[in-house]
């Protein structure tokens, strides 16, 4: 895992699709596209920005890791996911993941998630939902068919930040590989303390400490983290503990009744 975060941030390489817990996602081959000078310049600028942010996250004692506070800051949004098992309150991070947050909030406002089931649940790993088809193969971003610059048809791009991690309670976009974000999302639920496995020259000290409470550090760098549970982890644990059948689908449907936007 050494240097995995920095390498992932700078190269934007996804680790695995959330369609499998530990195995890799098979991607279809395609001819490489020619990059323009503008694209190359933009990517270089973005990589440099990430390097600077990563250095700040690793060396600045006052670096801000918003997941570590339950307070909702002025530049954060707040929502409540009302499920058939109880309510989950989260704060969202538009500063660090603007596309994912806008996509989520727009879908929520339009009722896209109303009645959608948690189609994949693995105790001590995560709970996944957001697919109107209910089988893990559906769901689209708000830009599909409307803005090819953001969503070419396969989903919108991953957003990486050295200030956000797959800690216990972290809200993240599910994907089937690099830049394939649609509407599906998951909440990290693992309670295992993996902090001792994390290299101190790769993970910020505050994040290593936070991982003592659980989470999935192996997913860092492969998925867009865009929110954090601030109330209702007992509900997340309850959903995670439900009896499942084929493909980790709960035997009794657990649904999102609606998503209430408390603060944008």
Describe the predicted segments one by one.
Residues 6-7, 18-264:
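Cyclophilin-like peptidyl-prolyl cis-trans isomerases
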Residues 1-16:
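Sec-dependent bacterial lipoprotein signal peptides
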